[in-house]
């Protein structure tokens, strides 16, 4: 199980990374997260929508109401230029953390 702290820290870059390829609505984002994480990250509506609203208020996303292919009215989110810049910054930071941890964790020492 992944800690709530790590999930919270990774939410923004994950959402921005998903939306960089095009607009999506909340349920699609939740399903995409589940898919890319192999089911280890299971987001809920209650977790996602407040984050989307904060990101929109912060200028990282814009939204619009649109009828989906299924004929339902849904709120679609799209990344802004500011969101792209934020994603670039987040990506650099996470890559640095990943690089440092990779060096520390490979190979794992045996416990004797």
Stretches found by the model and what they are:
Residues 33, 53, 68-69:
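Short secondary-structure boundary/capping segments
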Residues 3-47:
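N-terminal helix-turn-helix DNA-binding core of bacterial DNA-binding proteins
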Residues 48-55:
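Basic amphipathic alpha-helical segments that dock to polyanions
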Residues 69-91:
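Basic, amphipathic "hinge/linker" alpha-helix immediately C-terminal to the N-terminal HTH DNA-binding motif
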Residues 59:
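Glycine-centered, phosphate/nucleic-acid-interacting loop/turn motifs that mediate DNA/RNA or nucleotide
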Residues 63:
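Short beta-strand "wing" residues that participate in macromolecule-binding interfaces
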Residues 85-112:
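Amphipathic alpha-helical dimerization/coiled-coil segments
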């Amino acid at each position: 199980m992944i800690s709530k702290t790590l999930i919270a820290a990774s939410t923004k870059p994950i959402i921005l990374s998903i939306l960089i390829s095009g607009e999506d609505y909340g349920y699609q984002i939740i399903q995409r997260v589940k898919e890319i994480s192999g089911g280890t990250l299971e987001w809920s509506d209650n977790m996602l929508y407040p984050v989307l609203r904060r990101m929109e208020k912060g200028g990282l996303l814009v939204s619009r109401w649109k009828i989906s292919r299924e004929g339902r009215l849904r709120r679609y989110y799209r990344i802004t230029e500011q969101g792209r810049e934020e994603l670039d910054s987040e990506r650099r930071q996470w890559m640095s953390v990943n690089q440092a941890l990779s060096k520390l964790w490979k190979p794992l020492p045996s416990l004797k």
